[in-house]
């Protein structure tokens, strides 16, 4: 019988554990996580010793996460085994060690790394060792790390909100404007065309190299009554939404329009920057169109809302098609002069009255055909 792994002297330093040391960001919200354990599945990226790998998924659509370093190195570095970020501040360990001035040359060869990890493994299990060095660091450096961990991108508030209140006057509830950070929990400012390309230079023209204000597009024009009033066809229960940006998810549109009624389907095309909102009932579509009044803002993205128009695929009657054809001919004929129109009509009438003088030969096979079998020969 071959010897066990722990009985082998060369394998006695390999790590075996039943639970990983992972931060909350790497774990899903569900407290019941299914993990796959593989003993000695890979070598640690720091000490190069074989260790136990744990694999799991945050949800069904997420990628599979796994541990990258062994538990001993994770406890020595006070970091997560998966993302390798500091457990106290959530920062990279390189930034943390530079701020705490704990950067020291470690072992370079693989043998020395294994010896270093094995030497500190027993000390960590007893509650002493390199972990105590983090408690002896400077408090100012730890405060710097806290500010780095809680920092967010810079966002400048509007000037009227930064001005102090004069004469002790307080603003009413109607004048109060709440502006939250665009990177926080609340929604940010509404995106406009000026915020994307900057303020245009004053000048003439329709924009471009000469500067000036460009001509507004159809999405910037005010909505008309045809966009708000329901169409005459009672079978139309769809709304056509334009202005959909690439970062506006489909579930945000669904949660915004589902409050007016049950949705039959929602078709969103980020490539075409539009979406179709198909309601199950006509009353729900009318309520949504009445509430939006041709415009809507979803997660800071301005949208244009109008009624959907079905495309007629050759389902008109013959009389209706001939009527449209006559209207087209009449519209073209009214553009010319009256004399030229009269001459053209007269010439056409004379040509129609001329009888056909050319005899056309009948097609082959139209006459009586005589076969040899019919003659009896």
UniProtKB/Swiss-Prot annotation:
SUPFAM superfamilies, per database record: RNA-binding domain, RBD
Gene3D superfamilies xrefs? 3.30.70.330
User: Does Nucleus show up as a keyword for this record?
Assistant: yes
Q: Where is this region: Disordered?
A: 155-232, 333-377
Alphabetized PROSITE patterns for the sequence: RRM
Q: Which residues form the RRM domain?
A: 237-310
An annotated GO cellular component: Prp19 complex
UniProt record, GO biological process = mRNA processing; RNA splicing
Regions crossing the membrane: none
The Gene Ontology terms for molecular function here are: pre-mRNA binding; U6 snRNA binding
Q: What is its main location?
A: nucleus
Query: Pfam families, per this entry?
Result: RRM_1, STL11_N
Q: How is this protein organized at the quaternary level? A: Associated with the spliceosome.
Query: What family does the entry list?
Result: Belongs to the SLT11 family.
| Function of the protein | Involved in pre-mRNA splicing. Facilitates the cooperative formation of U2/U6 helix II in association with stem II in the spliceosome. Binds to RNA.
User: Under what name is this protein listed?
Assistant: Pre-mRNA-splicing factor slt11
Q: Which organism is it from?
A: Emericella nidulans (strain FGSC A4 / ATCC 38163 / CBS 112.46 / NRRL 194 / M139) (Aspergillus nidulans)
What is the taxonomic lineage of the source species?
A: Eukaryota, Fungi, Dikarya, Ascomycota, Pezizomycotina
Q: Which gene encodes it?
A: slt11
